[in-house]
Amino acid sequence: MKVFREYTTALKAGVSAAAVMLAVTPAAFANHHNDTAQTSVESPVHEANLQIEVDSRMAGAVQDLFIQEDFAELFGADATEGELMLARSAYAQRLFEPVWTYDGVDGLLEAVASVGRYGVVLGDEDRQRISILADRRFTGGDAADRARADILLTAEWFDLMARIGGPLENMGEATASQTNAPARSELVVLLERSGQGDVRSSAEHVAPQAAQFQMLQAELERYQMIAARGGWMAIPDADDALEPGMTDARVPALRERMIAEGYYTAGDLLERTTEFFAQNDAVEAETVSVTTETTLTEDTDSDLEAEAEAPDFNEWYITYDETLADAVEAFQEQHGLEIDGVLGPNTLEALNESVGSKVDRIRAAMDFWREQGDMGERFVWANVPSFTAEGWANNQREISMRAIFGLPSRATPIFSDEIEYAVANPRWYAPVSIVSRDKIPHMQEDPSYAARNGYTIVDRETGSTVAAETVDWYADNAGSRYQFIQAPGDNNALGELKIIFPNQHSVYLHGTPSVHLFDRAQRAFSSGCVRLENPVDMAMWVAGDDFESMEDLQEALDDSELRRVDFENNVPVHITYVTVTVAEDGHARFWRDVYNRENSIRMEERVAPLWEPQDEPAAEIAQMSSVAAGSL
């Protein structure tokens, strides 16, 4: 009874049960089991534990699994110490009563059935295994079998929560407090509530709270609905690009492709159909008038001329008009392509990606947010495939700008760090790698290159400035021996500002004199650092309420003074590689895999047929009208 008294005292004092129960030896567990065999249902200890109805045989069977050290084995080799600690805590607080009720099992099965909304894919084996355990929990042969099923269901719950919310290791780390309670101990409460039937709210609690994840959820649902409707067919390839105003047999297929993904609306189709009918009606009226007159004059040539003016359906139907071109431009903008409305190779490739491929890419993006974890209340997010850098605060995008990242051969590294300071009007100390690859070839061709571009050359061995004309630029050690230092100014490679987060990669955010490159859709041009379209705006955003730093920066910029300004608070910065993001309009952006790291893009195998001229186009016109009306 000693363990009971300790537990009751601790419970009344508000101390976690886990701190007591997890510290008890197996022998103490055994003594506790023997003592509790005679405990009545009305035990005050049980009343303090949510008034749970006692099944002493089940509680004893669960406790036996603790004593026999089978508990961890039931969770499997993949279970973390944190998960095991939390599970032990949950059962200890219940005095080993089973977690899962009828409602809880139903809720777990419902959560398994709807887990796809979180971008999680469960196999048939997973679903079947959980279903069998749910049945065994209440219909197992004896108490031991039912107890084992209950613990296995708890293990499945932890696995499901990890799949939805990401790794749970941090949720199970012990704190250094007196109670030694597990961190994120609310998972014990969530497990308790799930066992009573509220699994859905537990899933919502552990799911990533990042705005991007939640917007990706909505887009996942939208693209799954598109897939359920049959997706789209690939547009046939051709030797020549299709430009606005041209006629092409692929135009009807392009129109259908735009409709399928929502870029070309029912209203657009209905308006275009109405336009054709209006043209036809006008010409028919004119033809009747001319025919009447020719009856009186018997001038059949005029009649033929009027009839010849009737709009040709086939030509009209395959004309790449302005409305469709606008839809293609919107598609290009949302896929990181040059926005010109031209159906060229890159646009055609993006159009022909299958809807299933896009669904998988959205899921992969959701997986990223699961693995990334909490990025902080205020952070800078620089994403390579989207060529953007953004400032986020309280789950809101507050600043966004175009960015330039490393060439595929000099890829920008993916990592997280903290911004500490900025430098106004910086000098640029060219890294040895850039000197060897870029500067030495220029110097070999023209030694005046350094002076023309504002570089001072320093001999690393002597520390002295040297004249370019006196150096053997063909020497094997030229790249490592000579340091290139570029003075501040309009041509400085770092622009007017650099933002520093000390790291092993020597990567930072900075400006650039080559601002014209920001107009390019694909912006992998740097040697690894991140060039910002508006570095000053980003630095001011990082400063936040640190008005002194903001004033110091602005003063240094105004005076063209080289100055380091330390921020009052460090701000996390995350350089990532995610090929699907969601813009403020709520629509997904599918970026090109610029570093070929995902290799997950799949093309649609079904190819749309080319349009064939119709002698009787009435059926096609009727179909257009019905499609338009049906999708309004």
Predicted regions and their residues:
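Cationic-aromatic interfacial patches
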Residues: 16, 30-180, 299, 305
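Gram-negative bacterial Sec-dependent N-terminal signal peptides
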Residues: 2-30
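Well-ordered beta-sheet/strand-loop patches within structured domains
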Residues: 2-3, 29-82, 155-159, 178-185, ...
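Hydrophobic alpha-helical segments and their boundary regions
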Residues: 6-8, 15, 99, 108, ...
